[in-house]
C-alpha cells in the first residue's frame, strides 16, 4: 500500500473511532466532535506500537487545511452577527465573556511562570481547558513561526488532550454550582426572561396607534418626523373600514389607525406624539392585502438600498421587517440587501408577487453553494495570515497565521455579504458539512501525532500535573465571572448559563443549558450573542501568550 493510501486509511479509521466516541453520552453530555481527538490518540498509540510510518508532509497539509476550512466556515457563519453583537444590546454579555477570556489568559501566565511549564505544553493546556480547538491550531502555528522544534510543537496536542475532558465537565459543574449557591428556580428564571423580552429595547415589535394629535390632521406621513425616520415603519393604515398600504405622501387624518413596526422605545415615543395605543386589529385577513415573507436571491439587487428599489412607488408594497442571519431588523430605507435576507412584505397579492420576482425568492438557490467565493475567501484569508508584522525584540515577524487570517477575512466577507454577483452566503447545511470535515481532519492528525507518547506521559510523566493546571484554567474564570454576573449584574440564570457556554465556545455545554428548560431560548440567545467575539479572542489569545512568553524568555 502506498504512503498516501495508508495515511488516508488510518485517518478514516481515526474519524470512525473518534466520531463513535463523540456520540457516547452520559446524562446527555458527550465529547461531540472532540471525540475525534481521542480516537486519534487511541489509533496513534497502536500505530506507533506497530511501527507503521505515515507520510509526515501529507499529515501536516491535512492538519493545516482542516484548520483553514474550520475557521473560515465559522467566520462566514458568525460574520453577519459578529459586529452586531458588539453593539449595546449585547455589550454586557460580551464584557463578561471577555473577562472570562482575559482571566483564563492571566491564570495561564501565572501557572507558566510559577511552575516553569514549557511554552508548547502550557498553550496546549490552555486550549484544552477552554475546549477551543482553533486555539490549539493557532498556538501551533505561532510556535512554528517562532522556530520551535516540531517535536515540542506536537506536545501541545498531547497537553490539550489532557486538559480537554475537565474543560467539558468544568463548565457543566459551574452551571450546577451557580444553581446550588443561588437556589435558582429555573421555571421562575424562564418566566423572568420572557418578561424581559417583552419589555426589551432590542426586539422588533408592533403597535397600533389611533391618530389623536390635532396637529397631525391632514399632514403627509413624510412630514411627520417620527414617521419619516429609519427607526419606524408604518406598514398599514386603516381609515373607517378601509385598510391600505400607506406611502410617504399619504395624508393622515384624525381617527386613522396606524400599524407601526420598530423597537419598543421608538414605538413608545411615536405613541406620545401621535395619539393612543389601541387593541383594534389591523389584520389583512378578509381584505385585499396580504403579508408575505420573501427571500433575497437575485444577484441584481444585492448591495442595493431599499430606497433605491422604489417598491412602494412602483408596486404599492411596504417592507415592514428585514430578517438577516436570524436577527429581526427594522427595514430602514438605507438598509442594503444581502443574499439570504428575508423581507416581510405588505401589499396586494399581485404586487407582492411582482416584488418577489424582483428580489428573486428562489428557495432552491439557498441550497446551492457558490464555490468561487469560498476559494477566493480562503485564498485572501491565507494571504492576510501570511502578512508579516515586525515587532522590535522578537526573533521572527508575527503573523495572524492560518487560523487568524482566514477567520478575520471570513468575518469581513460574511459581514459584507456580497460583491457584485459574488455572495458569501453559505447554506447552513453546507457550512456545517465543511466545518465538521475541517475539524475532523485537524483533530485526527493532532490525535495521531500525540498518541505515541500519550499513555507514557499520563502514567509516568507529568500528565496528571497538566490535568491539574487545566482545572485551574477552566474553573477560576468561570466561577469568578459567574458569581460576579449573578451577584452584581443580577443576570438571569439561563442567560448566564448560555453566556458561560458561549465563553468556552462549547456546544455540549449549550446543549446542557438548553435542557435546563424545555421551551426557553434564553441560553441559546446569550450563547449566540457572545460566540462570535469569543471565538475570535480564543484564536488570538494563544498567539498573544506565545509572543509575550517568548519575549519574556
From Swiss-Prot:
Keyword annotations from UniProtKB, A to Z: Cell membrane, Membrane, Repeat, Transmembrane, Transmembrane helix, Transport
Q: Is this entry keyworded Membrane?
A: yes
Alphabetically, the GO molecular function entries are: monoatomic cation transmembrane transporter activity
What sections of the protein cross the membrane? 4-24, 28-48, 65-85, 95-115, 158-178, 371-391, 393-413, 437-457, 464-484, 493-513, 533-553
PROSITE patterns, per this entry? RCK_C
Database matches in SUPFAM superfamilies: TrkA C-terminal domain-like
Q: State whether keyword Nucleotide-binding applies.
A: no
State the Gene Ontology BP annotations: potassium ion transport
Record-annotated RCK C-terminal domain positions: 192-276, 279-361
Under the heading Pfam families, the entry gives: Asp-Al_Ex (PF06826), TrkA_C (PF02080)
One GO cellular component assignment for this chain's record is: plasma membrane
Membrane topology recorded in Swiss-Prot or TrEMBL: Multi-pass membrane protein
**Where's it found, cell-wise?**
Cell membrane
Record's family? Belongs to the AAE transporter (TC 2.A.81) family. YidE subfamily.
NCBIfam families per UniProt:
PRK03818.1 (NF003007), YidE_YbjL_dupl (TIGR01625)
The protein here is known as Putative transport protein YidE
Amino acid at each position: 500500500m502506498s504512503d498516501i493510501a495508508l495515511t488516508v486509511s488510518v485517518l478514516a479509521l481515526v474519524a470512525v473511532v473518534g466520531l463513535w466516541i463523540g456520540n457516547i453520552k452520559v446524562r446527555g453530555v458527550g465529547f461531540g466532535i472532540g471525540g475525534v481527538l481521542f480516537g486519534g490518540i487511541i489509533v496513534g498509540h497502536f500505530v506507533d506500537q506497530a511501527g507503521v510510518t505515515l507520510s509526515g508532509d501529507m499529515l501536516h497539509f491535512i492538519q493545516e487545511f482542516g484548520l483553514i476550512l474550520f475557521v473560515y466556515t465559522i467566520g462566514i457563519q458568525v460574520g453577519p452577527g459578529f459586529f452586531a453583537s458588539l453593539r449595546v444590546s449585547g455589550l454586557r454579555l460580551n464584557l463578561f465573556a471577555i473577562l472570562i477570556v482575559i482571566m483564563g489568559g492571566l491564570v495561564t501566565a501565572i501557572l507558566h511562570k510559577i511552575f516553569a511549564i514549557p511554552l508548547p505544553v502550557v498553550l496546549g493546556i490552555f486550549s484544552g481547558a477552554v475546549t477551543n480547538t482553533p486555539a490549539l491550531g493557532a498556538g501551533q502555528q505561532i510556535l512554528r513561526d517562532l522556530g520551535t522544534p516540531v517535536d515540542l510543537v506536537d506536545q501541545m496536542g498531547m497537553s490539550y488532550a489532557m486538559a480537554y475532558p475537565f474543560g467539558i465537565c468544568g463548565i457543566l459543574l459551574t452551571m450546577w454550582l451557580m444553581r446550588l449557591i443561588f437556589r435558582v428556580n429555573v421555571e421562575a428564571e424562564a418566566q423572568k426572561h420572557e418578561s424581559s423580552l417583552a419589555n426589551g429595547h432590542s426586539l422588533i415589535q408592533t403597535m397600533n396607534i389611533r391618530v389623536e394629535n390635532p396637529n397631525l390632521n391632514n399632514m403627509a406621513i413624510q412630514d411627520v418626523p417620527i414617521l419619516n425616520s429609519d427607526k419606524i415603519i408604518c406598514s398599514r393604515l386603516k381609515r373607517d373600514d378601509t385598510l391600505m398600504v400607506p406611502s410617504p405622501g399619504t395624508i393622515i387624518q384624525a381617527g386613522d389607525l396606524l400599524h407601526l413596526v420598530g423597537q419598543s422605545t421608538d414605538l413608545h415615543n411615536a405613541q406620545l406624539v401621535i395619539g393612543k395605543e389601541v387593541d383594534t386589529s389591523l389584520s389583512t385577513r378578509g381584505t385585499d392585502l396580504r403579508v408575505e415573507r420573501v427571500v433575497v436571491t437575485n444577484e441584481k439587487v444585492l448591495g442595493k438600498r431599499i430606497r433605491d428599489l422604489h417598491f412602494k412607488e412602483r408596486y404599492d408594497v411596504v417592507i415592514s421587517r428585514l430578517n438577516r442571519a436570524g436577527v429581526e431588523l427594522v427595514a430602514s430605507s438605507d438598509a442594503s440587501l444581502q443574499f439570504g435576507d428575508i423581507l416581510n412584505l405588505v401589499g396586494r397579492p399581485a404586487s407582492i408577487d411582482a416584488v418577489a420576482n424582483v428580489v428573486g425568492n428562489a428557495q432552491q438557490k439557498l441550497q446551492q453553494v457558490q464555490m468561487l467565493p469560498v476559494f477566493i475567501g480562503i485564498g485572501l484569508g491565507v494571504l492576510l495570515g501570511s502578512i508579516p508584522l515586525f515587532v522590535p525584540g522578537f526573533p521572527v515577524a508575527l503573523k495572524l497565521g492560518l487560523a487568524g487570517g482566514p477567520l478575520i477575512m471570513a468575518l469581513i466577507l460574511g459581514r459584507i455579504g456580497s460583491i457584485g454577483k459574488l455572495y458569501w452566503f453559505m447554506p447552513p447545511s453546507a457550512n456545517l458539512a465543511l466545518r465538521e470535515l475541517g475539524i475532523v481532519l485537524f483533530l485526527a492528525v493532532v490525535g495521531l501525532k500525540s498518541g505515541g507518547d500519550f499513555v507514557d506521559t499520563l502514567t509516568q510523566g507529568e500528565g496528571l500535573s497538566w490535568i491539574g493546571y487545566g482545572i485551574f484554567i477552566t474553573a477560576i474564570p468561570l466561577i469568578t465571572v459567574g458569581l460576579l454576573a449573578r451577584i452584581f449584574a443580577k443576570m438571569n440564570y439561563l442567560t448566564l448559563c448560555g453566556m458561560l457556554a458561549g465563553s468556552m465556545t462549547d456546544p455540549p455545554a449549550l446543549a446542557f443549558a438548553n435542557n435546563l428548560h424545555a421551551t426557553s431560548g434564553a441560553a441559546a440567545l446569550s450563547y449566540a450573542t457572545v460566540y462570535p467575539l469569543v471565538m475570535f479572542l480564543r484564536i488570538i489569545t494563544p498567539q498573544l501568550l506565545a509572543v509575550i512568553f517568548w519575549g519574556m524568555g
